[in-house]
Every structure is written in C-alpha cells, then in structure tokens.
Regions:
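Catalytic strand-loop segment that frames the active site of acyl-thioester-processing enzymes
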Residues: 1-20
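A generic structural signal for beta-strand entry/edge sites
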Residues: 1-4, 64, 78
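Hydrophobic residues in beta-strands and at strand termini
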Residues: 7-9, 54, 102
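A short beta-loop-beta micro-motif enriched in histidine and acidic residues
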Residues: 19-24, 41
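Short amphipathic alpha-helical face segments that pack within enzyme cores
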Residues: 24-28, 32
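Hydrophobic beta-strand-centered segment that forms part of the acyl-chain substrate-binding groove
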Residues: 32-66, 71, 97
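HotDog/MaoC-like acyl-thioester-processing domains
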Residues: 58-61, 71-125
Length: 125
C-alpha cells in the first residue's frame, strides 16, 4: 500500500509563471520516497538514484497536490520505489522511480533513527 502526502503549492515555488518548478517536484518526490522507506522498512536510507518524467504542468494555483509512493522491490540493501505527483483533479503530472540505499537497523539506530510510526501506533523497537 502507498504512503500518501499532501502539499499546497504557491507562487514562490514557480519556475515559469504559475508552474511549479521541476526541481521542487523532484525534491517533493525524493522526500516522499524517503518516507516510504522510513515507514515501510523501518530503517534509514539515502537516495542512490532518482529518475523523473514530467508529464503535465503542475500549477502553483492548484489547491493541493498529492504525492504517492510504494516499494516495488527490495534487493539486499536497495529498495526500489515508484512515485507519482497528482494535481487536485487526480491527474498524474509527474512520475518517478527512486533507488534507495538502505542502512541496517543497527546503523539506523546509531544515526538516531528510532522508527517511523503513526500517531495512533506504538512502535516495537
């Protein structure tokens, strides 16, 4: 199942007039991929590779955008994450594929990661 994030764009993040800058879109998708790894695998990870396809403009005047991501594969210390950025109409504007290098649970704890739960959930660490 997907990790879902919501964000409200505004004019200070535009590249072209009323259009969300592609670098901001990349940042949002990369950050969503990180939360997918944190939440689903309960370890830290860092971006190894990020590929984006810009399919349609994202308007900074849009009321809200939705970011979705899920793990498609995990091999050893790598997680493969597929992501979408949708406008308020539910149209897919940008897609991304990320490869995340995964830290071990021990290394994650050494770096201060204690797990990623929800407000109504108790983590068993």
């Amino acid at each position: 199942d997907d990790v879902v994030c919501f964000w409200k764009p505004d004019g200070e993040y535009q590249g072209w007039r009323n259009t969300l800058h592609g670098g901001i879109q990349a940042t949002l998708l990369d950050e969503t991929a990180a939360w997918v790894v944190f939440r689903k695998l309960q370890v830290m990870g860092v971006t190894s590779k990020l590929e984006l396809s810009y399919r349609r403009p994202v308007l900074t005047t849009d009321s809200q955008i939705t970011l979705r991501g899920h793990i498609t594969e995990q091999k050893r210390n790598l997680a493969y994450v597929e992501l979408t950025l949708e406008n308020s109409k539910g149209e897919v504007c940008t897609t991304a594929r990320a490869v995340y290098y995964l830290f071990t649970q021990e290394k994650s704890k050494e770096n201060g990661f204690t797990g990623c739960g929800t407000e109504d959930e108790e983590l068993l660490f």
